[in-house]
Amino acid sequence: MSKKSTFIILAAGEGKRMKSKYSKVVQKIMGKPMILYIIDEIEKNFEDGRIVVVVGNKKEDVYKVLEGRNVRFAYQEKQLGTAHAVMCAMSEISDDSEDVFVLYGDVPFIKADTLKKLSQKRKEEAAALCLLTAIFENPYGYGRIIADENGNVLKIVEERDATEEQRKIKKINPGFYCFEKQELVNVLSKIDNKNSQNEYYLTDAIEILNRSGKKVVKVTVEDNFEVMGINSRYELFVAEQELKLRINKEHLSKGVQIIDIYSTYIHPDAQIGKDTVIYPGTFILGKTSIGEDCVIGPQSYIVDSKIGNNCHILFSVIENSEIKDNVKIGPYAHLRPNSLLEEGVKIGNFVEIKNSKLGKNTKSAHLTYIGDADIGENVNLGCGTIFVNYDGYKKHRTVVENNAFIGCNSNLIAPVKIGENAYVAAGSTITEDVPANALAIARERQTNKEGWVLRRKQMYENR
């Protein structure tokens, strides 16, 4: 049987510096809860990995974000230190695990390649533990790595306990560990809380292992962004700005043109085709996919939507919708959830669409509400058309078949069907089905009252 890995993610902290009623690890970075960055990275790269999340304060927030994910939970009722958190998770470790990784839910950008290097180095050196180190030009506040001439880690000295000479050391401990499972079990039984905080520190494991003749080795991270901890609103801001630029640069390298990488927000899970142009002030969020040769923005907001090739979306909001090729939207249009625009559709300014399908080459140029509708191909919806879908108790659907023409300022009272090639005269309120090829007129006949203005004027002058 192949050996597996267990990943313990510590997420029980109070997060006081974040000043939030929500758990720190569910705070969003580029629209994605930070703990999901770690979960996704593990799931994509460690097929047999078991994930154990240690929760404590505000645990319901973490449960909600991870609902439906293949993770196990361990509960740390009292926060008694990092080693204590790991102790709480030990019952969830798989029996056939060889490597046990300890990670942090508020250090979200660690990469799978770095974790694999920890495992590889530990095995090559037959070590009990391989820990990750980083080199910081300003190491203030971090524990310093004390190593021998062969690079073996002897201990970690915290900032408050370090001598002046030790404080000059720039190699620090960001807190990522890869233990051999049985060695972790053994060392946890030897860690005590005889310190000023009465807590169980996982860093004590290093000296305990060394005293037992066990080997402790290290790997230095190549990109310090991977070990960036996020504890405050400012650190959340800094992390988001850096991640935003990295995401945008990656899209640039793949052939996407981003006019201003500083004012464009692209979710890490979004996909964009080459030769698409993104203008400033645009937000592309969630699992959105955008095809090639599109023009998006400026000032567009797109979330969890699928957009085809050669689409233009200007100053508009798109939510949970699908847009096929060669569609033009905006300015100031709003596609609400479950909308489908087939190829060649044109949607103009101040058009709102909700839970509706528009067939090929259908047009709605301006000032229209389309709710709960099934609209065919080559339909023209005149300015001011309203699909009246709600009777005060429930929603009803409207059907408009191919090649129909809806005149301006018309109301279609659902449920109603407009037949193929039918015309609805401008200003009509339609309450009954319109047959194919028919003209529907539902308005008061015009009456011209000759001389009325002069008579009215004379009446007021004679008062």
Swiss-Prot record:
Mg(2+) binds at D106, N231. It is an enzyme of class 2 (transferase). The active site is at H366 (proton acceptor). It is found in: Cytoplasm. One of its GO terms (cellular component) is cytoplasm. NCBIfam families: glmU, PRK14354.1. This is Bifunctional protein GlmU. Residues 255-463 are annotated as: N-acetyltransferase. It catalyses: alpha-D-glucosamine 1-phosphate + acetyl-CoA = N-acetyl-alpha-D-glucosamine 1-phosphate + CoA + H(+); N-acetyl-alpha-D-glucosamine 1-phosphate + UTP + H(+) = UDP-N-acetyl-alpha-D-glucosamine + diphosphate. Pathway: Nucleotide-sugar biosynthesis; UDP-N-acetyl-alpha-D-glucosamine biosynthesis; N-acetyl-alpha-D-glucosamine 1-phosphate from alpha-D-glucosamine 6-phosphate (route II): step 2/2; Nucleotide-sugar biosynthesis; UDP-N-acetyl-alpha-D-glucosamine biosynthesis; UDP-N-acetyl-alpha-D-glucosamine from N-acetyl-alpha-D-glucosamine 1-phosphate: step 1/1; Bacterial outer membrane biogenesis; LPS lipid A biosynthesis. Residues 1-233 are annotated as: Pyrophosphorylase. The lineage of its organism: Bacteria, Bacillati, Bacillota, Bacillota incertae sedis, Caldicellulosiruptorales. Its main location: cytoplasm. Binds 1 Mg(2+) ion per subunit. Keywords: Acyltransferase, Cell shape, Cell wall biogenesis/degradation, Cytoplasm, Magnesium, Metal-binding, Multifunctional enzyme, Nucleotidyltransferase, Peptidoglycan synthesis, Repeat, Transferase. One of its GO terms (molecular function) is UDP-N-acetylglucosamine diphosphorylase activity. InterPro entries: Bifunctional_GlmU, GlmU-like, GlmU_C_LbH, Hexapep, Hexapep_transf_CS, MobA-like_NTP_Trfase, Nucleotide-diphossugar_trans, Trimer_LpxA-like_sf. One of its GO terms (biological process) is regulation of cell shape. Its EC number is 2.7.7.23, 2.3.1.157. Residues 234-254 are annotated as: Linker. UDP-N-acetyl-alpha-D-glucosamine binds at residues 10-13, 24, 76, 81-82, 104-106, 143, 158, 173, 231, 336, 354, 369, 380. Catalyzes the last two sequential reactions in the de novo biosynthetic pathway for UDP-N-acetylglucosamine (UDP-GlcNAc). The C-terminal domain catalyzes the transfer of acetyl group from acetyl coenzyme A to glucosamine-1-phosphate (GlcN-1-P) to produce N-acetylglucosamine-1-phosphate (GlcNAc-1-P), which is converted into UDP-GlcNAc by the transfer of uridine 5-monophosphate (from uridine 5-triphosphate), a reaction catalyzed by the N-terminal domain. Homotrimer. In the N-terminal section; belongs to the N-acetylglucosamine-1-phosphate uridyltransferase family. Acetyl-CoA binds at N389, Y390, A426, R443.
